[in-house]
C-alpha cells in the first residue's frame, strides 16, 4: 500500500498542524553554541518550509491560537498590572513606554524609508523586539481594518515574513547586547548590585539555598536558667538571638504553647523550631541540657505554603513590617510575576505577590489569614471563569467607535488582553475565584502561541524566497536598528534622566523587552538576582504595551502618507 504523505497532510488540517508542531518543537531544542533556538522559532522554521510546498491550514485554527495566547498573557500580568501602573512603578512604566515607543517610531520611519507595506513593517517590529504580542496585535487589527481581501492576504503574508526574517536577529542581538552593554558603561554591574544590597539589606546570593525548618527539643538546665536571668520570652527575644522559635514547653508533664510572658524554669522541656544552621549555632547553654526525644513534644506539623498577598494591612507594607518571625513563621521565598525576588526587608509588597512561608500549620494559617490567603494547590481549573472572561474579551473587541468616516475598534487582541488582566487581578483578590494552575495556564499559552506560529509560517512560506532575495539586506539592517537602538535610548533615559541604579535599570530594560534569556545574562553579570526586581517591574506593563504597539502601528500607518 502506497501512502501519499503530501495528499494526506493536505487533506487533514489537524494532522498537518500537529506534524508541524511536533517537528518544530524538536527543532527548537537544538542549540547554536550557547543559544537554543526555542519553540517559537523551531515551529516557525518548519511551518515556513512546509508553506513553501503550498501546505496550508484553516485560518480558524490560527485565530483561536492567538486568542488563547493573548488571553493567557493578560491572566499572568493581571495580579501585578494595576499596582505597577498606579502606585510605585512610575520609573518602570516610563522605561517600558520609552522602550516600546522608540521602537515603534523607528520601525515606522524605516518602513517608510524602505518603501515597505504595513505587513512587512509590523512584522519587522515584532521580530526585532522578539515580541509575539506585537505580531498578534497587528494581525488582529489588520483583519478588522476593512482591507479588500487580496490586499489583506498580502499584508498578512508580509507580516509573517517580516517576523520570520528578523526574529533571530532581534534575539541574538539583544543577548549579545545584554552581555557586552554593561561593560561599556562606567559603573560595574556587580558593584551596583552590591550597593543596592547594602542600602536595602538584600541577599545578593542568587543561588541561595532554601531549607525547611526542623524541630528539636532540649531540657532546660542550670546554664540556660542563668542565661535567661528571670526574663520572659518576650524580653529575651529568643528568635533574634538564636534564629529559633520556642514552639512548645512541657512543664510538670503538661504540654503547652507558650506566650511572651512565659519564663523558662529548671526541668522544662522546650521544642525549638528553626533552620538547621540556626540549631547548629545555638548557644551551649541550650545544648548542655540533655536533648529530648519526646514524641508528643516533637509532634508538630511543619508545613510550607504559598501565601498570596491580598489584604490592605499587608499591601504597601515592607516585608519587615509583617514580623513573620514574631509569629513563629519563616520566609523562604518572595515571588512576583513568576520571578523570584531577593528577600529584602525593605521590599514593598504588591497585591498578588507570593510569599513561601514555613512553620507550624496553625501559625502559617493565622499569618496567611492576616496578609491574604493560601494559594490553592488544586489541579482543577475554573473553566467557567476562564470561558466567561474569554467571551467578555471577545465582546469588548467588537466595540467600535465612529469618528466621521473613520472607525476605530479595540479588536480581539486588546479585548482579550484586558479581559485576561481582569481575570488575573480578580484571582489575586478572591482566593476561590478563577483559579488556573500555573502549569495549565502555561500549557494553554504555549499551545496557543505554537498554533499561531504554525499558521503564520504556513501562510507566509510560499513567498519567503522572493522576500529574502528582494529585502533580506534591508531586513537585517532594520532588525538590528530596531532591536538595539531602543535599548540604548532606554539605558540613557534610565541612567541620566531617572538616575536609576544600574543593576535595577538593566533588569528593567530586559523586562521591557520581555526577554528571559537576556535577563539571565544580566543576573549572571551582576552575580545577583537583584536585577529581577527591575525585570518584574516592567515585564507586566511591557506585555500590554507591546500588544497595543501592534495595534497602533497598523492604525497610524495610513495617515503617514
Swiss-Prot record:
Domain named RCK C-terminal: residues: 200-288, 292-373
GO BP terms: potassium ion transport
Domain of life the protein comes from: Bacteria
Record's subcellular location: Cell membrane
InterPro entries hit by this protein: AAE_transporter (IPR050144), RCK_C (IPR006037), RCK_C_sf (IPR036721), Transp_YbjL_put (IPR023017), YidE_YbjL (IPR006512)
Keyword set, alphabetical order: Cell membrane, Membrane, Repeat, Transmembrane, Transmembrane helix, Transport
Membrane topology recorded in Swiss-Prot or TrEMBL: Multi-pass membrane protein
Transmembrane segments: 8-28, 32-52, 66-86, 94-114, 158-178, 383-403, 406-426, 451-471, 475-495, 540-560
GO CC terms of this entry: plasma membrane
SUPFAM superfamilies xrefs: TrkA C-terminal domain-like (SSF116726)
Record GO terms (molecular function): monoatomic cation transmembrane transporter activity
NCBIfam families, per database record: PRK04972.1, YidE_YbjL_dupl
Family: Belongs to the AAE transporter (TC 2.A.81) family. YbjL subfamily.
Record-given protein name: Putative transport protein YbjL
Organism: Shigella boydii serotype 4 (strain Sb227)
Lineage: Bacteria, Pseudomonadati, Pseudomonadota, Gammaproteobacteria, Enterobacterales
Amino acid at each position: 500500500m502506497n501512502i501519499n504523505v503530501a495528499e494526506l497532510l493536505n487533506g487533514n488540517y489537524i494532522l498537518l498542524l500537529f506534524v508541524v508542531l511536533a517537528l518544530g518543537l524538536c527543532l527548537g531544542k537544538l542549540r547554536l553554541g550557547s543559544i537554543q533556538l526555542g519553540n517559537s522559532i523551531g515551529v516557525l522554521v518548519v511551518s515556513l518550509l512546509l508553506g513553501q510546498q503550498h501546505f496550508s491550514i484553516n485560518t480558524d485554527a490560527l485565530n483561536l491560537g492567538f486568542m488563547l495566547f493573548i488571553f493567557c498573557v493578560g491572566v499572568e500580568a493581571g495580579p501585578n498590572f494595576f499596582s505597577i501602573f498606579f502606585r510605585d512603578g512610575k520609573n518602570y512604566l516610563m522605561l517600558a513606554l520609552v522602550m516600546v515607543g522608540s521602537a515603534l517610531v523607528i520601525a515606522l520611519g524605516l518602513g517608510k524609508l524602505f518603501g515597505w507595506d504595513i505587513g512587512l513593517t509590523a512584522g519587522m517590529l515584532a521580530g526585532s523586539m522578539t515580541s509575539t504580542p506585537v505580531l498578534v496585535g497587528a494581525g488582529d487589527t489588520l483583519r478588522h481594518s476593512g482591507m479588500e481581501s487580496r490586499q489583506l492576504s498580502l499584508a498578512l503574508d508580509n507580516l509573517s515574513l517580516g517576523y520570520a526574517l528578523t526574529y533571530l536577529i532581534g534575539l541574538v542581538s539583544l543577548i549579545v547586547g545584554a552581555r557586552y552593554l554593561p561593560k561599556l558603561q562606567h559603573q560595574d554591574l556587580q558593584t551596583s548590585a552590591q550597593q543596592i544590597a547594602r542600602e536595602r539589606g538584600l541577599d545578593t546570593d542568587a543561588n541561595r539555598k532554601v531549607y525547611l525548618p526542623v524541630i528539636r527539643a532540649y531540657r532546660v538546665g542550670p546554664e540556660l536558667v542563668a542565661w535567661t536571668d528571670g526574663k520572659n520570652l518576650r524580653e529575651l527575644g529568643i528568635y533574634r538571638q538564636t534564629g529559633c522559635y520556642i514552639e512548645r514547653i512541657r512543664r510538670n508533664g503538661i504540654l503547652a504553647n507558650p506566650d511572651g510572658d512565659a519564663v523558662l524554669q529548671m526541668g522544662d522541656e522546650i521544642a525549638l523550631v528553626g533552620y538547621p544552621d540556626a540549631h547548629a549555632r545555638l548557644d551551649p547553654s541550650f545544648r548542655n541540657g540533655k536533648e529530648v526525644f519526646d514524641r508528643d513534644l516533637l509532634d508538630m506539623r511543619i508545613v510550607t505554603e504559598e501565601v498570596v498577598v491580598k489584604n490592605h494591612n499587608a499591601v504597601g507594607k515592607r516585608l519587615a513590617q509583617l514580623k513573620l518571625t514574631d509569629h513563629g513563621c519563616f520566609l523562604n521565598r518572595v515571588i512576583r510575576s513568576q520571578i523570584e525576588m531577593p528577600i529584602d526587608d525593605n521590599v514593598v509588597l504588591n497585591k498578588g505577590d507570593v510569599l513561601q512561608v514555613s512553620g507550624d500549620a496553625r501559625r502559617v494559617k493565622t499569618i496567611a489569614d492576616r496578609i491574604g490567603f493560601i494559594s490553592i494547590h488544586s489541579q482543577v481549573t475554573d473553566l467557567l471563569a476562564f470561558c466567561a472572561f474569554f467571551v467578555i474579551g471577545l465582546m469588548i473587541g467588537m466595540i467600535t467607535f465612529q469618528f466621521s468616516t473613520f472607525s476605530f475598534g479595540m479588536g480581539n487582541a486588546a479585548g482579550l488582553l484586558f479581559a485576561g488582566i481582569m481575570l488575573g487581578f480578580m484571582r489575586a483578590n478572591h482566593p476561590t475565584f478563577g483559579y488556573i494552575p500555573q502549569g495549565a495556564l502555561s500549557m494553554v499559552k504555549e499551545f496557543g502561541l505554537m498554533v499561531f506560529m504554525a499558521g503564520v509560517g504556513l501562510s507566509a512560506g510560499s513567498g519567503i524566497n522572493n522576500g529574502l532575495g528582494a529585502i533580506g539586506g534591508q531586513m537585517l539592517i532594520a532588525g538590528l536598528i530596531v532591536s538595539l537602538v531602543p535599548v540604548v535610548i532606554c539605558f540613557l533615559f534610565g541612567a541620566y534622566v531617572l538616575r536609576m541604579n544600574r543593576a535595577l535599570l538593566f533588569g528593567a530594560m530586559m523586562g521591557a523587552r520581555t526577554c528571559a534569556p537576556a535577563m539571565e545574562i544580566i543576573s549572571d553579570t551582576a552575580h545577583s538576582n537583584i536585577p529581577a526586581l527591575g525585570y518584574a517591574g516592567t515585564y507586566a506593563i511591557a506585555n500590554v504595551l507591546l500588544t497595543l504597539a501592534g495595534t497602533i502601528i497598523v492604525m497610524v500607518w495610513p495617515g503617514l502618507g
